[in-house]
Amino acid sequence: MGGPELEQLIALLARLPGLGPRSARRAALRLLQQPETRLLPLAAAMQNAARAVKTCRVCGNLDSADPCSVCTDPSRENGLICVVESVGDLWAMDRAGIYRGLYHVLGGVLSALAGTGPDALNWPALMRRIESSRPSATPVTEVILALGATVDGATTAHWLAEQLRPMGVSVTRLAQGIPIGGALDVLDDGTLAAAMRARRSA
């Protein structure tokens, strides 16, 4: 139905996160019903992004500039590096607007199940960044491990903290616990335990 071109469009859309075959079919229909205002501008924007966007050689962010706009922002606190698993995590942290330091994208987490070891992660570049900052006026003094609250995230944070400690920087982790608006009776035991351990003065 619709020919091979339409089926290819639907199949490619269905590969996107959050879109299954039915959602992809609806999206394709919307795009094709208004090609001048939806489909063609989207296609042009995707081509422009494919040509212009690159991976930042410093932190691993995606940007049209290399180094990226975060790494070159003079208002950032150069003494802080927040380590995240993915570019999506970097964008989420930055969108929250509570952190004004630099970032480092690890590119994954250690996972015995998936066979992901230290060699697959971008941690040597983090060590080089810390080392090369030492002669500057603003050396890296703290590394914040902002990895997911999963077994793999916790394992990676523990392993990375062990690698970082000999470098003489403060290594911290994000507190974990009760989300804003979360009711206690619907939280799992692990979340409640983490919240209790991360309690602070009221």
Swiss-Prot record:
It comes from the Bacteria. Pfam families: RecR_C, RecR_HhH, RecR_ZnF, Toprim_4. GO terms for biological process: DNA recombination; DNA repair. Residues 79-179 form the Toprim domain. GO terms for molecular function: DNA binding; zinc ion binding. A zinc finger (C4-type) spans 56-71. Signal peptide: none annotated. Keywords: DNA damage, DNA recombination, DNA repair, Metal-binding, Zinc, Zinc-finger. May play a role in DNA repair. It seems to be involved in an RecBC-independent recombinational process of DNA repair. It may act with RecF and RecO. Belongs to the RecR family. This is Recombination protein RecR. It comes from Granulibacter bethesdensis (strain ATCC BAA-1260 / CGDNIH1). The gene is recR.
